[in-house]
């Protein structure tokens, strides 16, 4: 175990910019965040003690399902946590003995220890916390056993390309949407007159200002184009679509879920999205909370429409066990969260 202070490996500001400015990133991240935050939590007794002692189950249940602190509801609290998880790759929660508070991950440094794994946490380089006050949820990472890596890192190339394509389109139309042109003159023109002609062209010939006004070229002047611009190619439609699909794949959102129209395969993709993207995030958070508080924290999927077939299969399975006398009806109800 190393002893160097572990801060954010990535400059998360670029990911925050992509999240705020790119429609596909904003929509996909919000889908994962909102869907993960709406998965209900069930708190049950478990056969081991947690990091903190002496807290009753009713208190933990209230913190994790209703009011984590006096200032936030559970939905807002969870959404803040999961946004940090996707953007930074880490979640830090401070427990003061009464309430839970979210610490923005990019402000938190981890101080490793060769014997106890973590010596402490520092917030904004000035506020110190001991490991018994912090719940840390880490995203997968190859480079560090302490900090996770942002999910958006793998999509950085696609997001950068998408941004540059959009900027090119914006600049093209901002500059008048005029292809490169050359006016040929049979005689030498002074620099002053050249500038006047350029300004006259920019003022009169602006398609973005309401149309093309005809120009009269006299004195033997000719008009020629230096670039063959295909306006359809400027849409970058196929390239944009390809980049968007790559971003969705990195975030674990099936592209079909954002396509318009009726899709016959939407149901299995919706199910796969919950099983492979949403529930793994929820489980990682729950396992960290379970270790910290010493209570079993499990997701309640009974109200998730995409997972109703799994509930039917589970109900049939437990009914078979009850009918065979292997478990009691009460044990089956508990397993099904009823």
Label each region the model flagged.
Residues 306-338:
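Charged substrate- and nucleic-acid-binding regions of tRNA-handling and nucleotidyl-transfer enzymes
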Residues 205, 209, 251-255, 281-293:
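Alpha-helix capping/termination and helix-coil
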Residues 72, 82-90, 277-305, 315:
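Divalent metal-cofactor coordination and adjacent catalytic microenvironments
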Residues 213-216, 255-265, 288-295:
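Short acidic alpha-helical/loop segments enriched in Asp/Glu that coordinate divalent cations
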Residues 262-265, 297-306, 335-336:
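Small/polar glycine-rich anion-binding or flexible loop at a beta-alpha turn
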Residues 193, 197, 201, 243-244, ...:
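General structural feature for long, well-ordered alpha-helical segments within catalytic domains
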Residues 1-236, 241-242, 246-249, 253, ...:
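Structured, contiguous alpha/beta core segments that scaffold functional sites
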């Amino acid at each position: 175990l190393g002893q160097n202070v572990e801060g954010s490996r990535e400059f998360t500001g670029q990911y925050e910019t992509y999240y705020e400015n790119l429609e596909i990133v904003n929509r996909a991240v919000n889908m994962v965040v909102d869907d993960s935050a709406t998965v209900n939590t069930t708190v049950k007794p478990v056969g081991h003690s947690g990091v903190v002692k002496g807290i009753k189950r009713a208190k933990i249940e209230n913190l994790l399902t209703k009011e984590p602190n006096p200032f936030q509801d559970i939905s807002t609290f969870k959404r803040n946590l999961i946004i940090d998880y996707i953007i930074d790759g880490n979640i830090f929660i401070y427990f003061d003995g009464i309430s839970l508070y979210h610490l923005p991950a990019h402000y938190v440094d981890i101080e490793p220890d060769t014997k106890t794994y973590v010596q402490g946490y520092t917030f904004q380089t000035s506020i110190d916390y001991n490991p018994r006050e912090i719940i840390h949820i880490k995203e997968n990472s190859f480079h560090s056993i302490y900090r996770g890596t942002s999910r958006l890192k793998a999509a950085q190339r696609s997001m950068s390309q998408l941004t540059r394509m959009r900027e090119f389109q914006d600049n093209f139309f901002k500059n008048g949407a005029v292809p490169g042109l050359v006016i040929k003159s049979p005689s030498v023109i002074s620099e002053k007159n050249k500038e006047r002609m350029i300004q006259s062209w920019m003022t009169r010939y602006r398609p973005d200002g309401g149309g093309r006004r005809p120009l009269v070229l006299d004195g033997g002047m000719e008009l020629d184009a230096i670039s063959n611009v295909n306006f359809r190619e400027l849409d970058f439609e196929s390239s944009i679509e390809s980049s968007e699909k790559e971003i969705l794949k990195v975030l674990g959102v099936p592209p079909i879920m954002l396509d318009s129209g009726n899709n016959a395969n939407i149901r299995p993709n919706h199910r796969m999205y919950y099983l492979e993207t949403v529930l793994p995030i929820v489980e990682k958070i729950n396992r960290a909370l379970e270790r910290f508080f010493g209570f079993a924290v499990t997701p309640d999927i009974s109200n998730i429409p995409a997972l109703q077939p799994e509930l039917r299969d589970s109900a049939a399975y437990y009914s078979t066990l009850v009918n065979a006398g292997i478990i009691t009806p009460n044990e089956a109800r508990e397993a099904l969260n009823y």
